[in-house]
């Protein structure tokens, strides 16, 4: 089944798709209505806040009826003179999938280099577009998405060799650096000084950064060291690092060229609890984002003067996203406030004032009234006594104890699920659902210690947290015990797979999106692109203790004879991270072993990868099926 082009696999997939069509035929009118609700959101036009870089302001816009954004620029002295940088609607013509990887403007501001994925498999092609003539030239393919200019050349990551390769517009190429450890991935980017290229080698446990200046040699910032992770920002007159060398929850450090030993770095003591998750620098000031118990705080500091001032703190269900500082008429910091129940707002801090001012915000659907919805944060005890947070959103009104509860989690790699307004949640919220994000161990919501307590030989904590929070919510009067549903994507799909085996009666409906469910077998295959890095997170099956632990929870291996709930699997044919065959054989095994009459379906996207379809209407179709499957599975009338 691994070879999806094998005739037997082709026939099997066709039968699976036919079965899906047959089973969902009675829901045709429900699906049509749900699609109509979801597609109504696509009429909203979206435009980003201009960012000043060099002599231009850059911004993007999605217009009504268009699938993709158009990226524009205009001279900062002539704001009405608009020029197209990249039109993704034009570039995507003739493809069933299109994703922009990254783009960068040349030092002379005459050419844009960009990478694109036209199949969903994660392989990107490097192309150049002349901004005066509009002529597009293809340079190289089978690349990672990141890129950076180095003089007249473009640096990109060659996937097959895991190398930084310098490409000239005429097609010549030179390998500058090759990463030999398969556990490490490479990325490149242009520094804030707009001259230096930053080359990062990173695994789940360590970082190593090199820089490349115009006409110079590769310079090592700090050699890789087990457990040391760091990020680098280079300005015109400074180098600033965010590092966990001195503090597990990260600290800022200032360094001089040649200081490759972190013990020589000058660390700044931020007198606040929590994790430093991001920062920006403008002139002598730093804007620092600190996260403590799910609350983000923005702190403005002058490290030379020892000055430190809190600017803003988020509430429940909110987060900050720092933006590149503005070099316009009123220079200063910019950031976004994201909320689960309010469209994104953008703010600016003019350094001379040291106060945040709202500059614009996204539009809400025409019939959306924020005051009708509520966000709550609860901290609930897991079975080992650890308090696990969950963020809930719902529409005000009926008693919460009588409502359907739909939970989600991720819980791996120290990654947090995004906190942002999503109008596609409204169909469920308006039908009375309580939606919840469970911030399980293994994720990054509460810092590195939270991540480490849910990885490797602590992985069971991730799954137990999810089950325990669901039970505690119902016990506290949130959610009807017979109307619980859950979803998870990728590593979050592992959570769903374990829950299906270990707590099959708790949730009536489960949704697993591109799920990682054959954990043990996948980690045993060294030919897969992510195996060497993933064993640092999940464990090494060549180590007996790790193999036993993995076997005891790996969803596919632990399918057993019992009554399973309704399960919808969403799979992508071109998924380069989690093979579609995992989901297919997992569902087949559940159907074979299940003693109940619940429905197990697989929804296969033919033209997408791990992150799903790029076509907005196809994304809504997938979402509509998910919502109707959950509604029908819970026995609700729609």
Task: Kindly label every feature range from the protein language model.
Residues 77-79, 119-121, 132-135, 215-216, ...:
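Secondary-structure transition/capping motifs at alpha-helix termini
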Residues 89-103, 115-121, 351-353, 360-485, ...:
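Cap/lid segment of the alpha/beta-hydrolase catalytic domain
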Residues 244-245, 275-293, 380-389, 433, ...:
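C-terminal substrate/ligand-recognition segments
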Residues 440-638:
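Active-site-proximal cap/loop segments of hydrolase catalytic domains
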């Amino acid at each position: 089944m691994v070879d999806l082009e094998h005739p037997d696999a082709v026939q099997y997939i066709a039968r699976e798709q036919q079965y899906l069509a047959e089973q969902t035929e009675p829901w045709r009118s429900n699906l049509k209505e749900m699609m109509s609700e979801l597609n109504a959101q696509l009429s909203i036009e979206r435009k980003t806040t201009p960012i000043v870089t060099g002599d231009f302001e850059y911004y993007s816009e999605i217009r009504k009826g268009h699938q993709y954004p158009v990226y524009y620029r205009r001279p900062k002295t002539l704001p009405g003179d608009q020029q197209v940088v990249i039109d993704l609607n034009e570039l995507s013509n003739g493809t069933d999938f299109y994703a922009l990887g990254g783009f960068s403007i040349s030092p002379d501001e005459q050419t844009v280099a960009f990478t694109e994925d036209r199949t969903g498999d994660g392989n990107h092609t490097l192309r150049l577009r002349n901004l005066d003539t509009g002529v597009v030239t293809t340079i190289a393919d089978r690349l990672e998405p990141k890129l950076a200019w180095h003089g007249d050349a473009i640096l990109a990551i060659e996937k097959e060799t895991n190398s930084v390769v310098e490409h000239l517009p005429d097609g010549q190429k030179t390998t500058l650096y090759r990463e030999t450890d398969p556990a490490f991935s490479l990325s490149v980017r242009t520094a804030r000084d707009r001259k230096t290229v930053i080359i990062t080698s990173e695994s789940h446990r360590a970082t190593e950064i090199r820089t490349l200046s115009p006409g110079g040699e590769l310079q090592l910032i700090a050699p890789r060291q087990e457990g040391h992770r760091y990020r680098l920002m280079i300005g015109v007159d400074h180098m600033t690092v965010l590092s966990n060398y001195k503090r597990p929850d990260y600290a800022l450090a200032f360094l001089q060229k040649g200081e490759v030993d972190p013990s020589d770095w000058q660390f700044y003591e931020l007198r606040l609890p929590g994790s430093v998750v991001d920062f920006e620098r403008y002139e002598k000031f730093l804007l620092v984002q600190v996260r403590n118990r799910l609350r983000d705080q923005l702190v403005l500091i002058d490290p030379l003067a020892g000055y430190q001032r809190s600017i803003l703190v988020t509430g429940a269900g909110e987060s900050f996203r720092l933006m590149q500082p503005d070099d316009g008429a009123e220079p200063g910091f910019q950031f976004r406030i994201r909320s689960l129940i309010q469209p994104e707002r953008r703010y600016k801090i003019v350094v001379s004032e040291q106060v945040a001012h709202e500059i614009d915000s996204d539009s809400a659907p025409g019939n959306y009234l924020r005051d009708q919805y509520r966000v709550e944060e609860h901290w609930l005890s897991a079975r080992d006594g650890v308090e696990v947070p969950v963020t809930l959103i719902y529409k005000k009104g009926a008693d919460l104890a009588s409502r359907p509860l739909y939970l989600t989690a991720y819980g791996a790699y120290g990654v947090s699920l995004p906190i942002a307004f999503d109008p596609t949640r409204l169909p469920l919220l308006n039908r009375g659902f309580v939606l919840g994000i469970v911030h399980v161990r293994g994720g990054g919501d509460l810092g590195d210690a939270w991540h480490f307590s849910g990885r490797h030989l602590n992985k069971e904590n991730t799954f137990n947290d999810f089950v325990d929070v669901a039970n505690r919510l119902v016990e506290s009067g949130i959610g009807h015990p017979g109307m619980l549903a859950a979803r998870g994507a990728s590593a979050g799909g592992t959570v769903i797979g374990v829950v299906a085996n270990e707590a099959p009666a708790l949730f009536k409906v489960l949704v697993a999106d591109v799920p990682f469910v054959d954990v043990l077998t996948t980690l045993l295959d060294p030919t897969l692109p992510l195996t060497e890095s993933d064993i640092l997170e999940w464990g090494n099956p060549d180590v007996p203790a790790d193999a036993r632990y993995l076997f005891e929870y790996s969803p596919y291996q632990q399918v057993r004879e019992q009554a399973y709930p309704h399960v919808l699997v969403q799979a992508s044919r071109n998924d380069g991270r989690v093979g579609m065959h995992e989901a297919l054989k997992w569902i087949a095994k559940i159907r074979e072993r299940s003693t109940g009459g619940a429905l197990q379906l697989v929804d296969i996207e033919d033209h997408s990868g791990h992150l799903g379809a790029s076509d907005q209407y196809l994304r809504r179709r997938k979402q509509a099926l998910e919502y109707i499957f959950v509604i029908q599975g819970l026995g609700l009338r729609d």
